[in-house]
């Protein structure tokens, strides 16, 4: 008798999970059907240092140019979760568009990847999407201490978030998240509405780095974009 009841309970649970998944699937991965954007800014020196440790640092981004924060991507998001690869194959991305984005996204492979995985989910064409990427980046002011970083800097996630909040009126601590690896600051992720206004995003904020101290490796020298 116990086994019968247990099997019935398991079956009921599976039905609920399947129903919930089906409800999500009706919306999931439909181009243009999302709630907000996340602008992900990667601290390039951390990326290059970590990539070099694995023996695969891309020359375009990790050569001699002094990159600081670069655009990793502008990602359509749901309030929980995110769409990806909304069209397969993705509409063709012209190389002139790729070239036009290299000041913000320094590796062509990154531009192609971001379009295929995230850009098509915006519901915009290639030119329209990357225009929005550029506008989103222009909305964010990089705090002064991180513009020309000549020496390694030890920070806390809270310090970095607070610096961005102070530099960007309208941005709140629940609308930004710092990510990290085992010891380095990795990215700063900023939530924006579809019309590129700062907004809160509880799901992104919950997944922020929880380490006490992080290192920001220095830039390669010279002056980076701000």
Regions found by a protein language model. Name each.
Residues 1-10:
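Bacterial N-terminal signal peptides that target proteins for export
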Residues 15:
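Short, surface-exposed polybasic-aromatic patches that bind anionic ligands, especially phosphate groups
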Residues 21-23:
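Boundary at the C-terminal end of the N-terminal hydrophobic targeting segment
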Residues 25-46:
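Short N-terminal segments immediately surrounding and downstream of signal-peptide cleavage
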Residues 38, 52-226:
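Domain-level detector of nuclease and nuclease-like folds
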């Amino acid at each position: 008798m116990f086994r019968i009841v247990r099997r019935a309970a398991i079956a009921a649970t599976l039905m609920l999970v399947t129903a919930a998944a089906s409800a999500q699937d009706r919306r999931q991965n439909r181009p243009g059907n999302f709630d907000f954007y996340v602008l992900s800014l990667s601290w390039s020196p951390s990326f290059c240092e970590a990539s070099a440790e694995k023996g695969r640092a891309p020359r375009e981004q990790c050569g001699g140019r002094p990159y600081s924060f670069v655009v990793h991507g502008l990602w359509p998001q749901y309030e929980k979760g995110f769409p990806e690869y909304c069209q397969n194959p993705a509409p063709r991305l012209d190389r002139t568009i790729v070239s036009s984005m290299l000041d913000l996204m320094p590796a062509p492979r990154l531009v192609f990847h971001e379009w295929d995985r995230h850009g098509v989910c915006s519901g915009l064409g290639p030119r329209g999407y990357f225009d929005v990427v550029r506008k989103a980046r222009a909305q964010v002011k990089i705090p002064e201490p991180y513009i020309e970083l000549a020496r390694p800097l030890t920070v806390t996630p809270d310090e970095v978030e607070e610096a961005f909040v102070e530099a960007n009126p309208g941005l709140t601590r629940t609308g930004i998240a710092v990510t990290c690896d085992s010891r380095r600051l990795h990215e700063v992720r900023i939530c924006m509405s579809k019309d590129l206004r700062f907004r809160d995003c509880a799901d992104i904020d919950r997944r922020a780095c929880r380490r006490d101290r992080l290192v920001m490796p220095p830039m390669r020298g010279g002056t980076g974009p701000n």
